[in-house]
Amino acid sequence: MSLEQIIEQAFEKRAEYSPATMPQEVKDAVNSVLDQLDNGSLRVAEKKDGEWIVNQWAKKAVLLSFRLNDNYPMQTGEHVQFYDKVPTKFANWTEQQFVEAGVRVVPPAVARRGSFIAKGVVLMPSYTNIGAYVDEGAMIDTWATVGSCAQIGKNVHLSGGVGIGGVLEPLQANPTIIEDNCFIGARSEIVEGVIVEEGSVISMGVYIGQSTKIYDRETGEITYGRVPAGSVVVSGSLPSKDGSHSLYCAVIVKKVDAQTRSKTSINELLRLA
C-alpha cells in the first residue's frame, strides 16, 4: 500500500489506537509524513493552477501523530522542562544545521516537529504548531501563533500577538492560509480555514472566521472566508435590517496593487483608508 492508503485506513480506526496498540506499519507511515512535513517536501496544502489543494491525508497523519507517543519529560536548559508527546523542531539541531537552514530563532520561540521553517524566516518569541508551513522571508513576531497545518507565504509579516488558526482544536476541514506578501496587524486573528490572498494588509485587531462578514466598501458586496488579493482591511460593523443594533464585520476599505504596495508604507495605506 502507498503511504496515503496506510494513513487513510488508519485514520478510520484512530479511536482504537494508542501508543501501545498502533501497528508498526502505521507508526512508520506517520513518522514518514512528519519527516516530510518537517523538511518541506510535503505540505498539507499547496497552490496548483491558482487554486489551493488540501492534502487531507497529510492532515490526517498529523492527527494520528498524537497517538504515537505517551507524554514524556522534555528538558530545556537547566531549569526548564516540558511534558508533552510531540518533540520540538530544533531540539537536537547543531549550529551547522541552523546555518544551513538560514533561519533565526529568538528565545523562547518554539516550533514543533512536523512544521517547516524556510530560509530567511525570523521566529521572534512565538509558537509554530505541527504541520504548519512558513515560507521564505516571513517574520513571525512576538507572541504570534501559527496554528497546526497553517500555510504562511513568502515575506509575510505576522505582527505581535497575531493568531493564525489551526485544524486540530477544534477540528477544521481546511487549514488557514496567508498568501505571499501579506501584512497581518497586531492582535488580529485569522481562523477556520480563511484564505487571505496575496498582498493584502490586515489592520490591527481584525478578527476573521468563516462566519465573519467581509464587506467591500466600494462595491457593497458581502463575502465570507476569503480576503481578495491586494485588500486593505480594517475592523468595522454593519447595521441590522431594523437598525436596532450593529454587528462586527471586516471592511475592505481599498484595493492596492503590488506597485502601490512597494511605494507605500503599511501605515500610509491604513491612514489613507
Curated annotation (Swiss-Prot):
Signal peptide: none annotated. One of its GO terms (molecular function) is nucleotidyltransferase activity. Its main location: cytoplasm. InterPro entries: DapD_Trfase_Hexpep_rpt_fam, Hexapep, Hexapep_transf_CS, THP_succinylTrfase_dom1, THP_succinylTrfase_N_sf, Trimer_LpxA-like_sf. Keywords: Acyltransferase, Amino-acid biosynthesis, Cytoplasm, Diaminopimelate biosynthesis, Lysine biosynthesis, Repeat, Transferase. Its EC number is 2.3.1.117. One of its GO terms (cellular component) is cytoplasm. It is an enzyme of class 2 (transferase). It catalyses: (S)-2,3,4,5-tetrahydrodipicolinate + succinyl-CoA + H2O = (S)-2-succinylamino-6-oxoheptanedioate + CoA. It is found in: Cytoplasm. HAMAP family: DapD. Homotrimer. This is 2,3,4,5-tetrahydropyridine-2,6-dicarboxylate N-succinyltransferase.
